């Protein structure tokens, strides 16, 4: 269990600059030093211990906790401790709809399985060089996004998030589905959207690692109790071996051989956006504010060819474009620009 010394050594008490804060976090702030907010570690310790017990009890009931942390300084800790606890995670990029559109995500996982099987059994060699290259690129992309998430057999019961501000889409999806959300809250966060907040620094690597470690420890302790209650023994999985174990289980239990029809469909799906772009005469999307040649190509890949197409994008489509392709700036400004061009 975490101690006050651990919190101090990891710099959990350092918040953001005083000009960057959320007034709702006032109750967790001890004071300010040199324009930096100092978090009240007495409250942090109390909330930490309470949340530890909540997570431990959830794991003792067999519940699943999804770890989420995609910013650079969080990726390694999220991956390492989620694997250590045998829990799913997202550490590269949160794709809009990962939870709320889970059936579609399962289809993407199935596509990844098919391509991997084709590569293993030599089916890729039967395709043209261009088709094989397209599928290999698709595999690399899907593997990056779905690592840690692909072996999840059902929607998780809880979500543990590093940086609730950055991962706001993930938090919104979890809340929409009624999942409980756990998160360390820095001084710029909104505590109202988190079910189990732990006031603390969510930017420093040592602080992030401490949060992830403690949540993983709580899960491991809870899983041991679950195994004991169900007549089994808790099995410790050595670090680094979780991914291999999960991959083997997924291959044995969920992956079915790729059929010829599935292969043909996959090749057609990958080639379809470029074929459609060639057949359909669209507008010059580079005229849209903030959109260059590369991003215009990404819009075409997603099926948007004209100013009207972009102007009529739904909120969910906008979120997907922002998250999936890391648009520089506010993509809604680009949508507004497209609307002006369409009406001109």
Curated annotation (Swiss-Prot):
Please provide, alphabetically and separated by semicolons, the GO molecular function terms listed in this UniProt record.
structural constituent of ribosome
**What is one term from the GO cellular component aspect held by the record?**
cytosolic small ribosomal subunit
Give the keywords, sorted.
Ribonucleoprotein, Ribosomal protein
Question: At the top level of its lineage, which domain of life is listed?
Answer: Bacteria
Signal sequence residues: none
Q: Which gene encodes it?
A: rpsB
Which HAMAP family has this protein been placed in?
Ribosomal_uS2_B (MF_00291_B)
The organism's taxonomy opens as: Bacteria, Pseudomonadati, Campylobacterota, Epsilonproteobacteria, Campylobacterales
Protein known as? Small ribosomal subunit protein uS2
Give the InterPro entries listed for this entry.
Ribosomal_uS2 (IPR001865), Ribosomal_uS2_bac/mit/plastid (IPR005706), Ribosomal_uS2_CS (IPR018130), Ribosomal_uS2_flav_dom_sf (IPR023591)
> Which Gene Ontology biological process is one annotated for this entry?
translation
Which Pfam family, any one of them, does this sequence belong to? Ribosomal_S2
In which family does this protein belong, per the annotation?
Belongs to the universal ribosomal protein uS2 family.
Q: Which PANTHER family match?
A: 30S RIBOSOMAL PROTEIN S2 PROKARYOTIC AND ORGANELLAR, SMALL RIBOSOMAL SUBUNIT PROTEIN US2M
What Gene3D superfamilies does the entry give? 5' to 3' exonuclease, C-terminal subdomain (1.10.150.20), Glucose-6-phosphate isomerase like protein, domain 1 (3.40.50.10490), Helix hairpin bin (1.10.287.610)
């Amino acid at each position: 269990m975490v101690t006050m010394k651990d919190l101090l050594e990891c710099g959990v008490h350092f918040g953001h600059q005083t000009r960057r804060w959320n007034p709702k976090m006032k109750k967790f702030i001890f004071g300010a030093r040199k324009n930096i907010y100092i978090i009240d570690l007495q409250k942090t310790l109390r909330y930490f211990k309470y949340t530890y017990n909540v997570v431990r009890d959830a794991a003792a009931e067999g519940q699943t906790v999804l770890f989420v942390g995609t910013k650079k300084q969080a990726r390694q800790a999220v991956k390492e401790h989620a694997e250590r606890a045998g829990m799913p995670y997202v550490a590269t990029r949160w794709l809009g709809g990962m939870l709320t559109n889970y059936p579609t995500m399962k289809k993407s996982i199935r596509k990844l399985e098919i391509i991997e099987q084709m590569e293993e059994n030599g089916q890729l060699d039967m395709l043209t060089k261009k088709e094989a290259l397209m599928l290999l690129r698709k595999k690399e992309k899907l593997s990056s996004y779905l690592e840690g998430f692909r072996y999840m057999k059902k929607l998780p019961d809880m979500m543990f998030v590093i940086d609730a501000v950055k991962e706001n889409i993930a938090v919104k999806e979890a809340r929409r589905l009624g999942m409980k959300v756990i998160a360390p809250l820095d001084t710029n966060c909104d505590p109202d959207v988190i079910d189990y907040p732990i006031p603390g620094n969510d930017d420093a690597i040592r602080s992030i690692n401490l949060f992830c470690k403690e949540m993983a420890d709580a899960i491991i302790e809870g899983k041991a109790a679950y195994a004991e209650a169900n007549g089994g023994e808790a099995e410790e999985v050595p670090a680094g071996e979780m991914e291999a174990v999960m991959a083997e289980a997924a291959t044995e239990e969920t992956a079915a051989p790729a059929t010829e029809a599935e292969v043909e469909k996959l090749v057609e799906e990958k080639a379809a956006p470029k074929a459609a772009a060639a057949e359909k005469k669209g507008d010059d999307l580079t005229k849209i504010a903030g959109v260059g040649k590369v991003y215009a190509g990404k819009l075409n890949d997603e099926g948007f060819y004209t100013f009207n197409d972009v102007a009529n994008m739904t909120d969910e489509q906008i979120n997907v474009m922002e998250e999936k392709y890391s648009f520089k700036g506010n993509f809604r400004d680009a949508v507004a620009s497209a609307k002006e061009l369409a009406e001109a």
